[in-house]
Amino acid sequence: IYFIDITDHTNDELKKVIMNYYYKEKIEYVFYDTLKTDIDNIGNGEELKKTATILSNLAQNFDMYIGSTLQLAETSTDPINLSVNDMAVSRTVKEVLDTLCLFKPIHTENLGNYQYSLNETDEEVYELEKFKDPDVRYYSCVVDKNRAGAKPKLLFRLNLAYNRWEELGYLRLKQQNAHTSIKD
């Protein structure tokens, strides 16, 4: 695992760094936090799309995985209802992405509004457990774009102390008179 600080970069420099590691270290996975425009185009949303296109082309041409994070805007959108409109950056970047997953925490006071199932169509659902440990949190993951198929709404439990993510199942809003069961 290599960590490289390339905070201030041009698109050419970013491409060069990735390709150097690809050829020298045989990397297959790149995680880029946080996707941003090159240093000469800060604040220009269309330039962000160019950066994303460069990364997408590298991934396709060299058979590697490139994942990145994007910031969400500060909105009051319910975690299960996130969409591309909640992104802080240009929404046009979605056009070049193969997959877009939007994550947002579910606040403890709202846990009772949600339930989850192990399979998307299951009728048996489970409650979200409240934890005393503040490092344990739930996140909604809305798959906004997926060229490979389905676009589910997923539930993850995160333990910040151990940086452990666990996919629990398919998230849904509670229904009136819904059948619930208690998970062992």
Where are these regions (language model features)?
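C-terminal regions of RecA-like/P-loop NTPase motor modules
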Residues: 2, 11-30, 54, 60-62, ...
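A structural preference for short, hydrophobic beta-strand core positions in alpha/beta folds
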Residues: 3-5, 68
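A generic structural signal for short
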Residues: 6, 43-44, 78-79
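Active-site-proximal loop/turn and secondary-structure-junction residues that shape catalytic pockets
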Residues: 7, 36, 72-74
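Alpha-helix initiation and capping sites
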Residues: 8, 12, 45-49, 87
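Helical hairpin unit composed of two closely spaced alpha helices linked by a short loop
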Residues: 27-64
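Conserved H-loop
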Residues: 64, 68-71
